[in-house]
Amino acid sequence: MSQFNLNELNALPKAEQAAALALVNGQLEHLTAQERVSWALENLPGEFVLSSSFGIQAAVCLHLVTRQQPDIPVILTDTGYLFPETYQFIDSLTEKLQLNLQVFRAQQSPAWQEARYGKLWEQGVEGIERYNDLNKVEPMNRALETLGAQTWFAGLRREQSGSRAKLPVLAIARGVFKLLPIIDWDNRQVYQYLTQHGLSYHPLWEQGYLSVGDTHTTRKWEPGMSEEETRFFGLKRECGLHES
């Protein structure tokens, strides 16, 4: 697998681009998560960035990537509606792992948005999507542009939802390479990694949360619920950051 040129790959017809990515993904599937990170740092173009929601398993990918690239910018899109425990978790991990945290927010404050649009998350799928565009998608796009990102690491896993079940290790998203080193990990592997390296789950894990986002669109897990149903009232799984 030789070094990839982002501009050249972006310029290819979609069929040729897909074929090139499929070829390298066939090889990346057989590598460990650590080997995938190493391969990306050697073969994909910098600038490198890592995004994190500082959710339940966030410490895994943050530790995995920063062990090999300690100063990598870690992008957080802060909606202003995260749980207090999430902000405390962010502070704790930033100090413990010495993260190069880069926080991006919507151009309008939460209070201003509510004054202008009302509580968008209570306005069905359309309202949730508008909320996500304002508070997550636009800030992430701005982060990638501001940081000059060409390769983006993220901690998604296929096991998390149906919408992620077929994601490849490597893709092109928002015009940059996107690499998912732990895409094929299961919950057991996550637990083993955290335990092995003295890392913790998000504090709300012990209170019954399987997935953590904003306070107003996150629910505790209850018997009979899927993980997907604990977010956005079960109306959708993705917040827009990881949708093509």
From Swiss-Prot:
CDD domains membership: PAPS_reductase
Cited InterPro entries: PAPS/APS_Rdtase, PAPS_reduct_dom, PAPS_reductase_CysH, Rossmann-like_a/b/a_fold
Domain of life: Bacteria
Enzyme class (EC, first level): oxidoreductase
Principal location listed in the UniProt entry: cytoplasm
GO CC terms: cytoplasm
Keyword Oxidoreductase: yes
Annotated metabolic or biological route of this protein: Sulfur metabolism; hydrogen sulfide biosynthesis; sulfite from sulfate: step 3/3
Gene Ontology terms describing biological process: hydrogen sulfide biosynthetic process; sulfate assimilation, phosphoadenylyl sulfate reduction by phosphoadenylyl-sulfate reductase (thioredoxin)
Subcellular localization: Cytoplasm
GO molecular function, one term: phosphoadenylyl-sulfate reductase (thioredoxin) activity
Annotated active site: 239
Enzyme Commission code: 1.8.4.8
Reactions listed under catalytic activity: [thioredoxin]-disulfide + sulfite + adenosine 3',5'-bisphosphate + 2 H(+) = [thioredoxin]-dithiol + 3'-phosphoadenylyl sulfate
Keywords: Cytoplasm, Oxidoreductase
Function according to Swiss-Prot or TrEMBL: Catalyzes the formation of sulfite from phosphoadenosine 5'-phosphosulfate (PAPS) using thioredoxin as an electron donor.
Annotated family: Belongs to the PAPS reductase family. CysH subfamily.
Protein name: Phosphoadenosine 5'-phosphosulfate reductase
Source organism: Yersinia enterocolitica serotype O:8 / biotype 1B (strain NCTC 13174 / 8081)
Species lineage: Bacteria, Pseudomonadati, Pseudomonadota, Gammaproteobacteria, Enterobacterales
Gene: cysH
